Amino acid sequence: MIGDFICSSANDGTHYFRPVSARAEVFWKENNFTQKYVIDNTEDYYIVKSVNSEVICNAIREADMDFTS
């Protein structure tokens, strides 16, 4: 079973999030996370300050989604 998001830490005060399922993409957009929390992005990942990653992770879990590595 594949997860909905990839989340990793760069150990520089940021976390990288990547929606990998269609429902994760919709969830990310519906919750307006890009405008609320994203400080930068790469081709594949949204970069978020680590202090905000807990809010995002909790919202993902509350929506019955999960993470993959």
Predicted regions span which residues?
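Short, compact, well-ordered microdomains
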Residues: D40-S69
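Intrinsically disordered, low-complexity regions enriched in small/polar residues
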Residues: C7, R18-P19, K29, I39, ...
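Short glycine-enriched loop/turn motifs at secondary-structure junctions
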Residues: S9-D12, Y37-T42
